[in-house]
Regions:
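Conserved acidic functional residues
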Residues: 1
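Hydrophobic/aromatic-rich transmembrane helices and adjacent perimembrane loops
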Residues: 107-156, 168
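Short, well-ordered helical secondary-structure segments
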Residues: 88, 101, 105, 116-121, ...
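Signature aromatic-anchored transmembrane alpha helix within multi-pass, membrane-resident enzymes
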Residues: 17-22, 150-178
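Membrane-lumen/periplasm interface segments of specific transmembrane helices
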Residues: 5, 9-101, 105-109, 144, ...
Length: 178
């Protein structure tokens, strides 16, 4: 998406998207499905153990995607639960909430965020386990963009030198990362 909409290179964007989808399919339906049988037995639903975490939305990929389109109220109600809303501060606090000021970078993590927040497995939306690790690079990139934006805006509003404002933004980030 970034290559298509920001860089405006549709060929590269399509190539990266295709490679990503192919890798997702191989990893999810091949590698993980094969090795999950060692630990869970033959419990895969339509090819992947992960679909069991979305049975409240449907039994497989098609029915899950259909639920997202045909039952938006139920999906939004799920996303608005206290446990899932608590996920956001756990993801944003380590970067001083600055990623909220870099929404494009954070939006690139939408598939990962959706997978975590729509699951019925609490470890995926707790923000405390490895499931959230894939969001970290996007949160950091969003924080960098957010810090740059905030530095420019505060310097313009106050007339302070950018270096002074940036030092304050860095102190803010450091305080939140401790």
């Amino acid at each position: 998406l970034y290559l298509v909409f920001v860089v405006r290179d549709r060929k590269a964007g399509a190539a990266v998207a295709a490679a990503g989808l192919i890798w997702f399919a191989v990893a999810t339906f091949g590698i993980i499905a094969h090795h999950s049988r060692q630990f869970y037995g033959d419990v895969a639903v339509e090819g992947s153990i992960y679909f069991k975490r979305y049975t409240h939305l449907g039994g497989g990929l098609g029915s899950i995607l259909q639920a997202l389109v045909t039952r938006p109220g139920e999906v939004l109600a799920l996303l608005a639960t206290e446990e899932r809303l608590a996920y956001w501060p756990r993801i944003l606090a380590p970067v001083g909430f600055l990623a909220a000021l870099g929404p494009l970078e954070l939006a690139l993590a939408a598939p990962i965020l959706a997978a975590n927040l729509l699951a019925d497995y609490p470890a995926m939306y707790s923000g405390e386990y490895h499931y959230s690790a894939l969001v970290v690079p996007f949160a950091v990139a969003g924080a960098v963009t957010g810090a740059a934006w905030l530095t420019r805006k505060v310097a313009a509003w106050t007339g302070w030198p950018r270096a002074r404002v940036l030092a304050g933004v860095c102190a803010w980030l450091l305080a939140w990362s401790l």
